[in-house]
């Protein structure tokens, strides 16, 4: 971690989490996955239905938190997919896992790995990569997934 000692906080397994907006939601999963990769993301208040109230929290914060946009054709494991889930602005984040898979958490479901099917490709708004990302950073995420998850 750039020559510094990185202290990891305890996070629950990335899969199998119950959904509670603003507490254990898709952003929490994204934040915790990146923590396991050694990249800290801020926690911020997310009011219910923020995307219906004129806010655009993901697009307003991606660049400020170290992300830059990349072409969907250049997707690499660990990249963040922003999706429009019943909204006109991106209101859902998923981690691209490679080999056609993603990790995400949607309302009324447990967090899970899922195939990046046409359904999700149609909902995808954009793909983002963190400036500090490197391929080995995905190891912490992979280790957690191997310990606790299955494909749906």
Where are the model-predicted features located?
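...with weaker cross-activation on analogous glycine-rich loops/strands in unrelated enzymes
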Residues: 8, 46-111, 117, 151
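Short, structured interface segments
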Residues: 1-10
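Active-site nucleophilic cysteine motif
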Residues: 18-37
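Extracytoplasmic copper-binding redox domains, predominantly the cupredoxin/blue-copper superfamily
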Residues: 40
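Long, low-complexity intrinsically disordered regions
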Residues: 11-14, 29-32, 128-152
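Short, well-ordered, mixed-charge alpha-helical segments that flank or form enzyme active sites
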Residues: 2, 111-113, 136
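Flexible glycine-rich active-site/ligand-binding loops centered on an Asp-His dyad
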Residues: 118-123
């Amino acid at each position: 971690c750039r020559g510094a000692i990185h202290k990891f906080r305890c996070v629950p397994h990335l899969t199998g989490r119950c959904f509670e907006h603003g507490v254990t939601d898709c952003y929490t999963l994204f934040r915790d996955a990146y923590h396991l990769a050694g990249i800290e993301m801020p926690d911020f208040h997310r009011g219910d239905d923020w995307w219906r109230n004129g806010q655009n929290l993901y697009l307003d914060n991606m660049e400020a938190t170290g992300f830059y946009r990349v072409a969907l054709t250049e997707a690499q494991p660990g990249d963040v997919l922003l999706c429009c889930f019943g909204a006109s602005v991106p209101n859902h984040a998923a981690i691209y896992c490679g080999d056609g898979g993603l990790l995400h958490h949607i309302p009324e479901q447990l967090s899970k790995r899922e195939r990046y099917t046409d359904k999700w490709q149609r909902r995808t708004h954009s793909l983002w990569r963190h400036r500090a990302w490197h391929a080995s950073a995905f190891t912490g995420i992979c280790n957690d997934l191997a310990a606790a998850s299955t494909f749906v």
